[in-house]
């Protein structure tokens, strides 16, 4: 069910995921088809048939919207484009590689309904992650360092499946790779964050867009930047007009 009164906007950034977008769009519809929802796929400069495969689904899936970047801008920019275009007050995100299960989105919605006043619900894959042992170790170390330095209390910020307030997201500072630091950035705004266990699936089509070295060095630089942002931010300013 879709329409102008959208409850949930599902934002999916994709780049060269031609083989994944069709099954993923169908899974999103299966998970949310009885709700007022929309799904927004952002094609971030793909050079394969990602956009063409999505366009073929438009008549079958009226809730599907397709945005396209004219050149590759990165996952955070794609997510931000989708959130700005979203019509719903709540936004769910998924990675475009098919490893996040759209069937977990209703679980996050239930958590939202049971935890009024929480603005970000983070997926946590730790118990179900389907990656190599090295990838799991790499992620565990990165999450430990990040959590220790930022104090965000979130065990798995790299998980692509999230549900959050669109209003709060639009207040956040924009920078490349910001999607990896949403808990710290939401908390910077005074928002509450909780983690919810979700499933995780192996990648069966396509290839990862990230390597070990770019994750490592970019992560180190970005953690320093987020620490600076948190120190410099002053909240709670009340402006009164007499």
Predicted regions mapped to residue ranges:
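Hydrophobic helical membrane-anchoring modules
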Residues: 1-7, 114, 144, 149-152, ...
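Structured catalytic core of nucleotide-sugar glycosyltransferases
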Residues: 1-130, 167, 171, 184-196, ...
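Generic alpha-helical secondary structure signal
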Residues: 23, 49, 136-144, 215, ...
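Short-chain dehydrogenase/reductase
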Residues: 72, 132-135, 139, 176, ...
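Short, conserved alpha-helical segments within structured domains
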Residues: 75, 157-164, 178, 182
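Residues that recognize and position ribonucleotide moieties
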Residues: 84, 135, 162, 179-180, ...
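Short, flexible, basic/aromatic active-site loop/helix in glycosyltransferases
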Residues: 115-157, 162-170, 223-225
């Amino acid at each position: 069910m879709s329409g102008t009164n959208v409850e949930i906007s599902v934002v999916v950034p994709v780049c060269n995921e031609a083989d994944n977008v069709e099954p993923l769009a169908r899974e999103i519809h299966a998970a949310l088809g009885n709700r007022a929802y929309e799904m927004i796929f952002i094609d971030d400069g793909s050079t394969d048939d990602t956009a063409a495969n999505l366009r073929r689904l438009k008549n079958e899936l009226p809730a599907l919207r397709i945005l396209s970047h004219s050149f590759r801008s990165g996952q955070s920019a794609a997510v931000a484009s989708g959130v700005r275009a979203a019509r719903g007050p709540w936004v769910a995100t998924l990675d475009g590689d098919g490893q996040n299960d759209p069937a977990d989105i209703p679980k996050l919605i239930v958590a939202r309904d049971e935890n009024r006043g929480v603005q970000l619900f983070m997926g946590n894959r730790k118990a179900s992650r389907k990656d190599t042992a090295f990838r799991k170790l790499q992620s565990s170390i990165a999450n430990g360092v990040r959590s220790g330095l930022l104090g965000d209390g979130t065990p798995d910020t790299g998980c692509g499946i999230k549900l959050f307030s669109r209003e709060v997201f639009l207040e956040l500072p924009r920078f490349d790779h910001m999607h990896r630091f949403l808990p710290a950035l939401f908390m910077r705004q005074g928002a509450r964050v909780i983690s919810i266990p979700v499933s995780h699936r192996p990648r069966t089509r396509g290839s990862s867009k990230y390597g070990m070295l770019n994750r490592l060095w970019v992560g180190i630089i970005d953690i320093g930047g987020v620490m600076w942002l948190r120190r410099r931010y002053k909240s709670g300013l009340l402006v009164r007009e007499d």
